[in-house]
Amino acid sequence: MTNIRKTHPLLKIINSSFVDLPAPSSLSSWWNFGSLLAACLAVQILTGLFLAMHYTSDTATAFDSVAHICRDVNYGWILRYLHANGASMFFICLYLHVGRGLYYGSYTYSETWNVGILLLFAVMATAFMGYVLPWGQMSFWGATVITNLLSAIPYIGTDLVQWIWGGFSVDKATLTRFFAFHFLLPFIVSALVMVHLLFLHETGSNNPTGIPSDPDMIPFHPYYTIKDILGFLIMLTALSALVLFSPDLLGDPDNYTPANPLNTPPHIKPEWYFLFAYAILRSIPNKLGGVLALVMSILILAIVPMLHISKQRSMMFRPLSQCLFWLLVAVLLTLTWIGGQPVEYPYVIIGQVASVLYFLIFLVFMPLVSAVENYLLKW
């Protein structure tokens, strides 16, 4: 008798995706982050659902409703901090996942890669709108500054901003629609994840060597399910430590002050995971130029497959490209630090140099170094 998981219409889809899926035998722990992201998304949707049961999206009561969740709702504090710090964990896994894709040349699967970029934009939009909901000082001013960037779009900019605000400033209408979108977007992200997996399973996984692994495949279960469970446990330990010992470590103290349109905080900044893009935005004196640079800082990932001229897929055997990759990581960390600093000397010039370097690495240095490595292969 054939096993039900191989015959049942629904179970056989799950079976072919997570049980009997042929996977390369050489996958390292860098391939854990896909499943960790799925776990993060599940945690965010569950905690978010319970938070939404107690939250009110009205400017008069939003801040108090968050305080009420933390003080009066059973285990409301842990729900709130799991949700807030779960977002940080989500972005850590997301950036490591993208970094792994860049390092090992996974971007050559262009459909999977492009859906991944869409996912990145969708998750960033969700996180931004979620940051506005507690209606603290940084929520309000962050929403004002970031949405106002759209006014840089020629001709339709001002109308577009007022349309998003639902009025002439960030107010009740803005908060209500941001809550609606923040609730809806994770489900759109879940649908995009399915598409991402669909395209991935069309081609099969890449592996650290970048060499086709068809002759050497092993079943996903039990080998990689066990490996993923270990990843879950490590991430859960880190998240629990963050939530239980220093829940406000990654937040902004200004967000514990209720939103006040008459009082601007001394330094407006987004959450830490957007600081690199915020630093790139600030490093360009022109408003439209800054907005374009901000969008391009993420959209540049879509150009990476077109600039891949190396004869080898992975960076595993390309030491020059490896140096460049770690330079890129250093530049990103520098930009993240600069994004959190005030706009003054020497931070401005450091931010500008790092921003130029960021784009140069992608557009000039990577292809150049690949060409040099191709030449060295002839020796």
Curated annotation (Swiss-Prot):
Bilayer topology: Multi-pass membrane protein
Subcellular location: Mitochondrion inner membrane
Family annotation (InterPro entries): Cyt_b/b6_C, Cyt_b/b6_C_sf, Cyt_b/b6_N, Cytb/b6-like_sf, Cytochrome_b, Cytochrome_b_C_euk/bac, Cytochrome_b_N_euk/bac, Di-haem_cyt_TM
Gene Ontology annotations of biological process type: mitochondrial electron transport, ubiquinol to cytochrome c
Residues the entry annotates as binding heme b b562: H83, H182
Pfam families: Cytochrom_B_C, Cytochrome_B
Binding site for a ubiquinone: H201
Parts of the chain that traverse the membrane: 33-53, 77-98, 113-133, 178-198, 226-246, 288-308, 320-340, 347-367
Gene3D superfamilies in the cross-refs: Cytochrome Bc1 Complex, Chain C (1.20.810.10)
GO molecular function: metal ion binding; ubiquinol-cytochrome-c reductase activity
Residues binding heme b b566, per UniProt: H97, H196
GO cellular component: mitochondrial inner membrane; respiratory chain complex III
Main location: mitochondrion
PROSITE patterns: CYTB_CTER, CYTB_NTER
Entry-linked SUPFAM superfamilies: a domain/subunit of cytochrome bc1 complex (Ubiquinol-cytochrome c reductase), Transmembrane di-heme cytochromes
Family: Belongs to the cytochrome b family.
Protein name: Cytochrome b
Origin species: Brachyphylla nana (Cuban fruit-eating bat)
Gene field: MT-CYB
